[in-house]
Design a protein with these regions (language model features):
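Buried hydrophobic residues that stabilize the cores of well-folded domains
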Residues: 21-405
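Short, surface-exposed loop/turn motifs with a glycine/proline- and acidic-biased composition
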Residues: 421-442
C-alpha cells in the first residue's frame, strides 16, 4: 500500500516564520522546531527586553533559575549581541546582516570552566541570491581547530541558481561541501514555463541516491487561477495562498502512475487539495489535504488524510485510514499559544492522538504591552500530557527603533561586529511576512 504522497513537513514548512513579539530565548527553540507561522508586522515602536531570565522546572513542581541573558538590538529589533550566563559558562553570539536584513555571519564565543575569557568557537557564513530573499547561495560552518577556523565538511553547501532570459528560475541545485574544494550535488529543483508567464507549468524535485540525482517528485500541467509571478519554491502552502492558487496538476510517478491533483479554494485563505490515482489498481486510495484559517490572528489547522477502501472499491470519505492534523493557535497579539500535531487512524478524526505539541502562556505586563513572562509546556508522548518546559521573565525594555545599539567585539576575531546582528542561528528577516520553502532553507 502506498503511503502519503507528500510529507506534511514539505507541505507546511514554508509557512513558518517567527512572531517578532515572542521572547528572544523562545524564538530560537520554536524556529528550529519549525512550529511558528508568520505573525503580523510589528508597530513602528519596537520595545525589546535587554534582559531575560530563564527558569527550568524542578522536582518540587516549581521553577529554578537556569541562566541570565542580555541583549542589544538594531533599529529593526534584530538582536545585535546576546550574552548568556548560567553561572558556570558564558556564551556570546554576534552576527552581521546585509542591508536586506539577511544573516551574513554569526560567531559564537564561549568561556572555559574557571575562566571569564570569551573565545571564538564556531562561525556561520552566508551569501544570498540577489533576487530571492533569504535564499542562501552559500553556507559555511566552521569551528576552531588548533587556533584556526576549519570548515565542518558535510554541513557546508552552495546553491546554484539558473535563470532563463526572462529572469525566471529554471533550476536550483544544492551541493554539499564534503571535502576540501569538492562539492557533491544533493538536491535539485527544476521549473519550466510557457510563453512569458512567470507561473511554472512543471516542477521537478530531484534528490541524490549517493552518486547521481534521481527524480523524487514531478508535477506537470500546472494550472493556476492566480499567481503573483514570484518564485514559489517547492510544493507547499505557498502554491495555494498569498496571491497564488494552483487549481490542478498531474503528479508523475513511475511506481503509481499518474496522480491527479485538484484544489478547491474555500475562501479566506482556506483550501482543499484532493489527490486521486489513474491506475485502476489504486482507485481504492486517495489523499486529501486541507488548510483551514481559524481566525484573524493567523490561527490555522492543516490536515493530511489518507483514504483506503479495503474491498478495492473507489475510496470515499468513509474509508479514512491514517493521517496527520496540525493545529496552530495565536492570541490577539499574534503570538502562538498552541502548536499541536495529532496522528489520525481508522478510529476517526475525533479520536486523533496527540503526537507533539507546545503550549505558551503570556503575561503582557509591560508599560507598552510587552511580554514580561512566558511559560512554555511541551507535550510528553510517554506521559500523554503537557509538561512544564521553561519560564522566561523579561525586563528592562528599550525602544530600539530610536537607533542602533553598538557593542565591542574582540578585534582578533575573524569577523568584527560592525553591522546588524541576530541571535543563536535564528535568521530574523526584516520583513516578518516573507515565506520561503523548506527545501531551500538552511
Amino acid at each position: 500500500m502506498r503511503k502519503f504522497t507528500l510529507s506534511v513537513a514539505l507541505a507546511l514548512g514554508c509557512t513558518y516564520s517567527t512572531s517578532a513579539q515572542i521572547p528572544s530565548l523562545l524564538q530560537s527553540k520554536l524556529i528550529n522546531a519549525q512550529k511558528i507561522k508568520t505573525a503580523a508586522k510589528e508597530a513602528n515602536d519596537l520595545w525589546k527586553p535587554s534582559h531575560e531570565t530563564l527558569y527550568m522546572p524542578n522536582d518540587n513542581d516549581g521553577w529554578t533559575k537556569d541562566s541570565e541573558h542580555y541583549y542589544t538590538y538594531d533599529a529593526s529589533g534584530n538582536i545585535l549581541v546576546s550574552l548568556s550566563d548560567d553561572g558556570k559558562q558564558k556564551i556570546k553570539i554576534v552576527s552581521t546582516y546585509d542591508e536586506n536584513g539577511q544573516l551574513l555571519t554569526e560567531t559564537t564565543y564561549r568561556t572555559d570552566n574557571g575562566s571569564d575569557e570569551l573565545k571564538p568557537r564556531m562561525m556561520k557564513e552566508y551569501t544570498y541570491d540577489p533576487y530571492i530573499h533569504d535564499l542562501a547561495t552559500s553556507f559555511f560552518f566552521s569551528t576552531i581547530s588548533n587556533g584556526e577556523w576549519q570548515h565542518f565538511y558535510g554541513s557546508c553547501y552552495k546553491r546554484t541558481v539558473e535563470r532563463d532570459d526572462q529572469g525566471r528560475v529554471t533550476s536550483i541545485t544544492k551541493s554539499i561541501l564534503d571535502a576540501p574544494d569538492h562539492y557533491t550535488d544533493q538536491i535539485k529543483s527544476l521549473f519550466t514555463y510557457n510563453g512569458t508567464s512567470k507561473a511554472p507549468v512543471s516542477y521537478e524535485y530531484q534528490t541524490s541516491n549517493g552518486s547521481t540525482l534521481t527524480t523524487s517528485a514531478k508535477y506537470v500541467d500546472l494550472k493556476w487561477t492566480k499567481s503573483t509571478g514570484e518564485y514559489l519554491g517547492a510544493y507547499s502552502t505557498n502554491w495555494f495562498t498569498n496571491g497564488n492558487f494552483l487549481e490542478s496538476a498531474t503528479i508523475k510517478s513511475d511506481s503509481y502512475g499518474d496522480i491527479l491533483l485538484t484544489a478547491t479554494d474555500k475562501g479566506n485563505g482556506s483550501y482543499e487539495v484532493e489527490q486521486t490515482y489513474t491506475a485502476e489498481s489504486l482507485k481504492s486510495q486517495k489523499e486529501i489535504q486541507k488548510y483551514e484559517t481559524l481566525d484573524d490572528n493567523g490561527s490555522f489547522k492543516y490536515s493530511d488524510l489518507f483514504y483506503f477502501n479495503i474491498e478495492g472499491n473507489a475510496a470515499t470519505e468513509d474509508d479514512l485510514y491514517q493521517g496527520t492534523i496540525i493545529e496552530t493557535l495565536y492570541d490577539d497579539h499574534k503570538n502562538i499559544v498552541l502548536y499541536e500535531s495529532r496522528n489520525v487512524s481508522q478510529t476517526g478524526i475525533e479520536n486523533a492522538k496527540i503526537a507533539d505539541g507546545i503550549r505558551n502562556e503570556y503575561v503582557y505586563g509591560g508599560e507598552h504591552g510587552e511580554i514580561t513572562q512566558t511559560t512554555t509546556w511541551n507535550f510528553s508522548y510517554n506521559d500523554n500530557a503537557y509538561m512544564p518546559d521553561s519560564k522566561v521573565v523579561a525586563d528592562d525594555f528599550r525602544n530600539v527603533s530610536t537607533g542602533i545599539s553598538h557593542c565591542t567585539i574582540q578585534q582578533e576575531s575573524k569577523h568584527n561586529a560592525s553591522g546588524v546582528y541576530t541571535l543563536q542561528g535564528v535568521k530574523i528577516a526584516q520583513s516578518a511576512t516573507a515565506h520561503y520553502p523548506t527545501a531551500y532553507t538552511s
